[in-house]
UniProtKB/Swiss-Prot annotation:
Species whose genome carries this gene: Salmonella newport (strain SL254)
Protein's membrane topology: Multi-pass membrane protein
Family per similarity comment: Belongs to the multi antimicrobial extrusion (MATE) (TC 2.A.66.1) family. MdtK subfamily.
Keywords: Antiport, Cell inner membrane, Cell membrane, Ion transport, Membrane, Sodium, Sodium transport, Transmembrane, Transmembrane helix, Transport
Predominant subcellular localization, coarse grouping: membrane
Record-level GO BP terms: sodium ion transport; xenobiotic transmembrane transport
Descriptive protein name: Multidrug resistance protein MdtK
Matches recorded under CDD domains: MATE_NorM_like
Bilayer-spanning residue ranges: 11-31, 53-73, 93-113, 127-147, 160-180, 188-208, 243-263, 276-296, 314-334, 350-370, 387-407, 418-438
Compartments (UniProt record): Cell inner membrane
Amino acid sequence: MQKYTSEARQLLALAIPVILAQVAQTAMGFVDTVMAGGYSATDMAAVAIGTSIWLPAILFGHGLLLALTPVIAQLNGSGRRERIAHQVRQGFWLAGFVSVLVMIVLWNAGYIIRSMHNIDPALADKAVGYLRALLWGAPGYLFFQVARNQCEGLAKTKPGMVMGFLGLLVNIPVNYIFIYGHFGMPELGGIGCGVATAAVYWVMFIAMLSYIKHARSMRDIRNEKGFGKPDSVVMKRLIQLGLPIALALFFEVTLFAVVALLVSPLGIVDVAGHQIALNFSSLMFVLPMSLAAAVTIRVGYRLGQGSTLGAQTAARTGLGVGICMAVVTAIFTVTLRKHIALLYNDNPEVVALAAQLMLLAAVYQISDSIQVIGSGILRGYKDTRSIFFITFTAYWVLGLPSGYILALTDLVVDRMGPAGFWMGFIIGLTSAAVLMMLRMRYLQRQPSAIILQRAAR
């Protein structure tokens, strides 16, 4: 029991800064929305539309670079720290190549925006302008993620938290300058949010790079031979590990976007109730997601040490802590669901629907916690392909079709409306949780030599 208690303390020490970093990131989006809304409703809508396109594109790159964390954790655990600098350099090359692709996609996103049904031309122009300002921050964001993944792979999660809050503090005044046109800058409205956020991502990257350069604990990792050329072998391996994670993230984000589109014709009350429940459950998701990042670090480190039993302990402890957290958040959600809904809206119909959907959200929080921590465990074992196949099958083959049938057809029961889609979420997430656990059990039952050989690749 003592080993699990000790492991839980180490996991929480890693996870809490990640949680706070995610809070800072979420707060940046909130600040952008509020400040753009203070300028005009059209600008706020433009920021919302632009963000809905920015997120899938940038999260694809973010997911690709997550491969660095288990690689660095494993090298650190095995005492091969001299190889980490080369992996990080290749991470920067990969981030640079992906940035170009993301920027091209975002520059041409106007075709998608203007094809939206009945969109106001002025709104479309502002959304395109916002994206074309924001896209210059894509390299800064992805380079920051490489530096952050280096730190987290070395079990240092506090720098990411500090840089997150630094970004938030810089974002507010820079937003003010570019939205309203102060200190000689042009008055850009919502487009100014894009300029400010792009600038903030570069500030966060430069600050993180400065920390790494001066940190005593990373002196042995610094590159003294220049930046070096791309290494096709290392980059290929990073892509093999990262691409399944990137695709899983992309399909998860697009799933919720598709459901939002399917709910939109059902009416204002249904859309508002769905959005409130989804927004709140997304906030709760920060806890298991951050714990999953910590589990990846611990599992990778233990495998680097050659301890498959230590990796099992880290995995089981992570699941136990995650389930306990999920039970607490589920009880909190059930108990205060009406009060929470009232924070968003005071329309009785909207509040009633949101409260009903939050009951379903409380049910799936446990499954969601298990599946996301399971994903973190599999990343630690460098078994990322299974993450993609499991999430794609659970969300798109099981969850979305069953949600559609329950919500919009009479095939099984009378049409359930938004609640049907939430039942689909429960089916999809529970399926993912079960499949993740089966895959984890299969991996852990393999001979230690095979597990360690996979981890050392």
